[in-house]
Amino acid sequence: MSLLNVSGISKKQGEAFLLRNINFIQEPSQRLAIAGSTGSGKTTLLKIIAGLVQPDDGNVMFEGTRVKGPLEKLLPGHPQIAYLSQHFELRNNYRVEELLQMANKLSQADAELVYKVCRIDHLLNRWSDELSGGERQRISFAKALVTAPALLLLDEPFSNLDAIHRSVLKSVIKDAEEQLNTSCILVSHDPVDLLSWADEIMVIHEGKIIQRGAPEEVYNDPVSEYAAALFGKYCVITPGLIRLFPFLENDKRRFIRPAAFEINADENGAVGEVISSSFMGSYYEVEVALAESKLTIYHTQNILRGEAVRISIQSV
């Protein structure tokens, strides 16, 4: 049996559609990510799945049972689905342990495992107003996990976190999946968060799913320029680019990522001029002007502005 079956979900705000006929299935332990621009309907979809927002049409089935909306029950939500908002809040004037005990549905041993997984066992005696942003996020995560959810909906969990706390929270999510058997749906604006984690990515645009697939497929073969832009820099295959690289005329791709280009000494390569070179840590991001195109290329070495280079491209 599928963990989650979303069928025909639509939601309007006034005359405008927030979601249009959303359909998908999530299997147990499947890592499902949702990508889309601000206002595309991602948060509304998560809240409908959690039973916090009433859909206008369609059904959400969780382990074979329909998830009721807030208009159908006294207390909104589903006991086995936890929604963690990017706008998390913790009550003031409480110790961390007290906040967690209010929500806890686990045995003491299982609750202690959650605290360990979330890296908060040393924070239990702290007051809620004595916590850093990263600590508050992990405690909110633990507060969701102690309700014993089978499905965790993560809405921009890494927003407003520095690199260190982002890394810690990613490890916490991984351990929750592996040690607590929790399935997750993740929404993030950072393509690295989604591409490195997901088994499958859904791309939403104006309330509709426009693409679904493995991270490699969604990244390398986006269905539109909108989908391409969500996951980083790209180059549109134009007639001018085809004139420089004739084999592209038979290429199925509409867009090419920077990693597909190479700067080398190939005599058959197209000649370009370096516009800029920026150090990105493990590589340089090089902007190159060609006769009819401008390309972004990832390269291992710095190249001076104005230098002439030859560009080749990987065929498929």
Protein language model annotation of sequence segments:
Residues 50:
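Helix-to-loop junction immediately C-terminal to a conserved catalytic motif
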Residues 108-124, 175:
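Conserved ABC ATPase "signature" region
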Residues 66-82, 218:
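ABC ATPase NBD coupling module
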